[in-house]
């Protein structure tokens, strides 16, 4: 099997790590599962044994052939998950050992459809997992943290060493669960919320009052000290800022997560 670096392939081979993942997933007979990047099927076998249905998305044509030959019950979609319509997977649990180079753009796409997804369970670079689960005031708290924690309750489940993969990655990994939630407070405009967060963290060393100077935020009304820096403001603080700027043209430029 040829490992293709452009796809960021690191195949999970450690049986204890595989068993631990299946234990925390606790797939039920009624579950429908979307597996992103199944590779050689390290997780696929167990998923098929437990779930009602498993759909696998694989970009590597050679691996698509391997999966189709190996698993008669598996529905395999050949393609890039970043280009597929997420709506078609409504109600499914999402599982994946993710190539590190697609984590951020994939999460961006999934967050936009979070209300349709039951949960997301991903192997990812440990550094990213720490950012996802960080707290306001820490150095790891940033744009990804705010956006992810707005959309989901996130649980850092366990670490996985580089020795669990072939070829071994240069970094450590972690397995994380993201559970979409219904918030009692929501930005009126998600594009504006994303733009506010992007602008605030785009100038981390600046006080938030200066970083968002062009938005004319009514700081006293939103209850936030403008002398704070972005990493000191929690998710609901950014929600209040975004809500106070509804209709402001400066908040209408949205981009993917960094």
Question: Across the structure, where does each feature detected by a protein language model lie?
Answer:
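Catalytic cores of RNA-modifying enzymes
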Residues: 1-199, 240-244, 252-258
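Hydrophobic alpha-helical segments, especially transmembrane helices
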Residues: 5, 205-206
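Conserved Class I S-adenosyl-L-methionine
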Residues: 169-170, 206, 210-258
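Short amphipathic alpha-helical interaction segments
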Residues: 189, 193-196, 200, 204, ...
């Amino acid at each position: 099997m040829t490992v293709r670096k452009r796809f960021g392939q690191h195949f999970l081979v450690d049986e204890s790590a595989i068993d631990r993942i299946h234990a925390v997933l606790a797939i039920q007979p009624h579950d429908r599962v979307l597996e992103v990047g199944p590779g050689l099927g390290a997780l696929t076998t167990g998923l098929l044994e437990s779930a009602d249905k498993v759909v696998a998305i694989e970009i590597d044509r050679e691996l698509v052939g391997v999966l189709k030959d190996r698993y008669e019950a598996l529905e395999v979609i050949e393609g890039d998950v970043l280009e597929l319509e997420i709506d078609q997977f409504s109600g499914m649990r999402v599982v994946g050992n993710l190539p590190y180079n697609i984590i951020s753009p994939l999460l961006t796409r999934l967050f936009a459809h979070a209300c349709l997804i039951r949960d997301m369970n991903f192997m990812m670079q440990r550094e990213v997992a720490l950012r996802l689960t960080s707290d306001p005031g820490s150095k790891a708290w940033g744009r990804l943290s705010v956006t992810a924690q707005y959309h989901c309750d996130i649980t850092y489940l366990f670490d996985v060493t580089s020795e669990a993969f072939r070829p071994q990655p240069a970094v450590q990994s972690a397995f994380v669960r993201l559970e979409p939630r219904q918030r009692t407070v929501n930005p009126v405009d998600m594009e504006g919320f994303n733009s506010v967060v992007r602008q605030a963290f785009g100038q981390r060393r600046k006080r938030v009052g200066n970083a968002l100077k062009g938005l004319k935020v009514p700081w006293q009304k939103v209850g936030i000290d403008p002398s704070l820096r972005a990493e000191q403001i929690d998710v609901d603080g950014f929600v209040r800022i975004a809500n106070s700027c509804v209709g402001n043209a400066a908040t209408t430029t949205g981009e993917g997560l960094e």
